[in-house]
Structures are given as structure tokens and as C-alpha cells.
A protein has these predicted regions:
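Conserved mixed alpha/beta catalytic, RNA-binding, or beta-rich assembly cores of soluble enzyme
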Residues: 116, 127, 135-143
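Short, charged beta-turn/beta-strand-edge "cap" motif at the junction between a beta-strand
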Residues: 235-240
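A common structural junction motif
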Residues: 151-158
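Single conserved hydrophobic/aromatic residue that forms the stacking wall/gate
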Residues: 252-261
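Electropositive, beta-rich accessory/interaction domains or terminal extensions
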Residues: 1-130
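A basic, amphipathic helix-loop patch mediating RNA/tRNA/ribosome contacts
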Residues: 178-227, 244
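N-terminal beta-hairpin/loop module of FHA
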Residues: 161-181
Length: 261
């Protein structure tokens, strides 16, 4: 396989490790003439992989084409292969718990999985929650690990049971349109206006690695954001820059504090 170096020019330096991994997957498909299934990846990575697959003429199918989710698994494959939903080797686990005592949050579930199981984020996908239920998409091979390793989240006893995809919780993310005054498109300045925090406070959030831009952790307060960027701030939610009106900026924001990173 001849690597087209021009591909790298279309993406940032932060994307290089994932591009390299994507090219490894593509080479494996070409060498084995067999499909390759990725771990769970985010929408930005999915976009990169779609470009790579198109460049090298491989088949491309996302699990999101069957099940609308944010984190997806992708199949790269030769022309003879016809993907089915079972080929993505995903499972949906219901987190059963006594909801009358306390409501599980996205952040608590994520923290338990990362800290208690010590597994990589790419082994599980979206965490879904509503007032009384919670679910998680996982790599099917790791169902026993999740079921045996998670017996309590916070103070609540839990059990994990596989359920059909048709029973999944439907996301209800309420995005609101807001217009804010902006002195510049520096990350700390924009967050200060959007979150109504001081520049010092937003700089501290950035330094603590609590801020992502397009699914990448950004650690520089002077990072320049642009129209189309998706910004996620731990415990504050998300905002997307929709339009630059000169001295003002139009945003879509998720109003409820919710950690989805």
C-alpha cells in the first residue's frame, strides 16, 4: 500500500496518531482481503476514517448507520463483503438499580467504568440515561467483564443485563440557541462569555484538561476556535459555534450540566 502523504494536510497534528492507526487497518484489509472492525471511535475519528476509506477505495460502514449513536464502530472491508448489524459485535447492557433512591448520572457511570474496571474508553460506547434507567453500549467480547466487575455505582447496588437494541433509551438532548458577546475567539475568552466565568476560571478548566474541542483535549488557553467547532466542558455541557457575527457569536448549547466526555 502506498501512503498518500497529502491526506495528513487536511487534518491537525493531533489527528496524526489516529490517521496512522487508520492506515494500519486499511493495510490489513488489503493484505488479508478480509474486513476489519474498529473499536469505538468518536465522530471526528469517524470522519477521518471515512476519508481514508474513500481515498483507498475500501468499503465503509458505520454502526451508526444501523443504530444512531455518537460513539460508533466501523467496518472497513473489501468489495465482496456485505455488513450486517451483528458484524459490529456490539451489545447493549441495561444497568439495573433501585431508581427510587437515587438517579444514576452519566458522569458516575463513566467514572466507575474507568476507575473500577481500568479499561480503555474504546471498549465501550455511548452511556444512555434518563430519569429511571441507564444503559451502555459495549464490545460484545467484554460483556462478562462488565457484568462481573461492576456491582456497585457510588452507593447503589447494580446489575448489568443485556437487552435488545430496540429497548435503548432515546437521547433527549435539548440544544438552545444563544448569542454572546466575544472579545476574541481564544478558547478561554469564548468560554468565559458562554459559561459566565472569569478568564482565570476558564483557564483553570483548560489547564485541568476539562475542555475538549472536536473531541481533543486542549491545554492552551489561547487556542483559537472557529465556526463549526464543538466544545465540551466537563460538568458544564457542550456548545457549538454556529456563526461569527463580528462582535457576537451564535452558539448551540446543551443547557443542563452533563459530563459526556
Amino acid at each position: 500500500m502506498t501512503v498518500n502523504r497529502a491526506i495528513y494536510q487536511h487534518f491537525s497534528q493531533d489527528d496524526i496518531p489516529f490517521i496512522d492507526k487508520g492506515l494500519e487497518w486499511i493495510k490489513r484489509v488489503e493484505d488479508t482481503y478480509a474486513p476489519v472492525l474498529t473499536p469505538f471511535i468518536n465522530p471526528h475519528q469517524e470522519q477521518i476514517l471515512r476519508v481514508l476509506a474513500g481515498t483507498y477505495g475500501l468499503g465503509y460502514q458505520s454502526s451508526g448507520d444501523f443504530l444512531p449513536t455518537e460513539s460508533v464502530r466501523v467496518l472497513l472491508y473489501p468489495d465482496y463483503f456485505e455488513p450486517e448489524i451483528s458484524d459490529f459485535e456490539m451489545a447493549l447492557l441495561e444497568i439495573c438499580y433501585p431508581s427510587k433512591f437515587e438517579q444514576l448520572s452519566h458522569g458516575k457511570i463513566l467514572g466507575t467504568i474507568i476507575n473500577q474496571l481500568g479499561i480503555d474508553r474504546k471498549l465501550f460506547g455511548d452511556i444512555l440515561v434518563d430519569e429511571k434507567r441507564a444503559q451502555i453500549f459495549v464490545n460484545r467480547d467484554f460483556i462478562p467483564l462488565f457484568q462481573d466487575g461492576i456491582r456497585k455505582i457510588g452507593r447503589l447496588p447494580v446489575s448489568l443485563e443485556e437487552c435488545p437494541f430496540t429497548d435503548r433509551i432515546l437521547s433527549k438532548i435539548d440544544y438552545r440557541e444563544r448569542e454572546i458577546l466575544v472579545s476574541s475567539f481564544r478558547l478561554d475568552a469564548l468560554l468565559s462569555s458562554a459559561l459566565k466565568l472569569s478568564r482565570n476560571q476558564t483557564s483553570q478548566l483548560i489547564e485541568k484538561k476539562s475542555v475538549q474541542v472536536n473531541y481533543h483535549v486542549v491545554e492552551k488557553s489561547d487556542y483559537q476556535v472557529a465556526v463549526g467547532d464543538l466544545i465540551s466542558v466537563r460538568k458544564f455541557g457542550r456548545l457549538k459555534i454556529v456563526k461569527d457575527n463580528g462582535q457576537t457569536c451564535l452558539l448551540y448549547t446543551s443547557p443542563s450540566p452533563r459530563d459526556r466526555t
